[in-house]
Amino acid sequence: MDAGAQPPDTEMAEAGGGQQPPAAAAAAGAGAGAGMMENIQATLSHGGRFIQYNIFGNVFEVTAKYKPPILPIGKGAYGIVCSALNSETGEQVAIKKIANAFDNKIDAKRTLREIKLLRHMDHENIVAIRDIIPPPQRNSFNDVYIAYELMDTDLHQIIRSNQALSEEHCQYFLYQILRGLKYIHSANVLHRDLKPSNLLLNANCDLKICDFGLARTTSETDFMTEYVVTRWYRAPELLLNSSEYTAAIDVWSVGCIFMELMDRKPLFPGRDHVHQLRLLMELIGTPNEADLDFVNENARRYIRQLPRHARQSFPEKFPHVHPLAIDLVEKMLTFDPRQRITVEGALAHPYLASLHDISDEPVCSSPFSFDFEQHALSEEQMKDLIYQEGLAFNPDYQ
């Protein structure tokens, strides 16, 4: 992106009002930072080709080019994330360790999908994979280490902090999300899990979309497979188990995220499925019959028996939000996905006129192929596919 497109005052202080810097969120959507740790012991292994670190009692074993200091910056259900220096390139990276990555087939498939998708994509607003670190020995391949470009924080951390955000910040974040999403959708891919913690940021407000483990093709009919997208950002067609879904599901999520950014609290913080649907109808109103054409008869019956809600006035409910921003959000938060604004339509909306430049909003040169998922892969096949990805980054390693 042309640096000139950036608003002049988007240099951002560290979240948390000048105290501890925010967690350097890795592409795992890592949560809060684990704090700086000094004197982490490093031991060379496998004839000096690898280096082992002991972090939180976990062995972190990477190729020897990743030099100290290595710092834990996040922890999640998948494992641990550390920042490290690649001594060959001089670049700081975020390394995610996925421990026992092949124990659960669904998780292994998610890891493989994320690797293949991110290797296919090349865009300023999508986090890049820098390395898949091969195991010291192919026959004992259990843990997967993925190195991503390192970012300073994520949108969830910023929203929770006392970091002041100007209208220009929010506008610029929205623009970058849509710019990245245009590229993703052009590759025939739906992200399906957009939320603030999957939007990484650095101090000069560059934004990158991460976590493609739930991504799917836009033409897929096998609907709810492994579908666990965060409820608060879920489009109504997903809440109603619609058998068909489109790129419009991601647009709904972006509308929710933008309003959370403006309001500093989630727009629809549903406690469960039913509560989620109720919250969104309380704001945008009960849909009419024409808006329900896309859902099945069971879902239509269910909605008809719910208490009816009139649409609330967005300008009255959110008086602090710019009228053009309200207009765009209302077009994103449209119940019927067929009527919802597209990513291209959103980029061309007057609210983003100062940033929009169609010649600098690239699309993907070729659609992504999910063919590798067409057949049930064994654990060994998945290991081999990920191992081959590692060799692509490390051609000298055999």
Curated annotation (Swiss-Prot):
Residues with the Phosphothreonine modification: 225
Induction per the UniProt record: Induced by hydrogen peroxide and abscisic acid (ABA).
Activity regulation information from UniProt: Activated by threonine and tyrosine phosphorylation. Activated in response to sphingolipid elicitor (SE).
GO biological process: abscisic acid-activated signaling pathway; defense response; intracellular signal transduction
UniProt key word Transferase: yes
Chain positions covered by the region annotation Disordered: 1-26
Residues the record lists as Phosphotyrosine modifications: 227
Entry EC number(s): 2.7.11.24
Keyword tRNA processing set for record: no
Keywords: Abscisic acid signaling pathway, ATP-binding, Kinase, Nucleotide-binding, Phosphoprotein, Plant defense, Serine/threonine-protein kinase, Transferase
Gene Ontology CC, one term: nucleus
Protein kinase domain: residues covered: 67-352
Molecular functions (GO terms): ATP binding; MAP kinase activity; protein serine kinase activity; protein serine/threonine kinase activity
SUPFAM superfamilies membership: Protein kinase-like (PK-like) (SSF56112)
Catalysed reaction equations from the record: L-seryl-[protein] + ATP = O-phospho-L-seryl-[protein] + ADP + H(+); L-threonyl-[protein] + ATP = O-phospho-L-threonyl-[protein] + ADP + H(+)
Post-translational modification remark: Dually phosphorylated on Thr-225 and Tyr-227, which activates the enzyme.
CDD domains, per the entry: STKc_TEY_MAPK
Classification via InterPro entries: Kinase-like_dom_sf, MAP_kinase, MAP_kinase_CS, Prot_kinase_dom, Protein_kinase_ATP_BS, Ser/Thr_kinase_AS
Binding site for ATP: 73-81, 96
Purpose of the protein: Involved in sphingolipid elicitor (SE)-dependent defense signaling pathway. Acts downstream of heterotrimeric G protein alpha subunit and small GTPase RAC1. May regulate the expression of various genes involved in biotic and abiotic stress response. Involved in an abscisic acid signaling pathway that regulates the activities of antioxidant enzymes and the production of hydrogen peroxide. Acts downstream of CCAMK.
Record remark: domains: The TXY motif contains the threonine and tyrosine residues whose phosphorylation activates the MAP kinases.
Protein name stated in the entry: Mitogen-activated protein kinase 1
Protein's organism: Oryza sativa subsp. japonica (Rice)
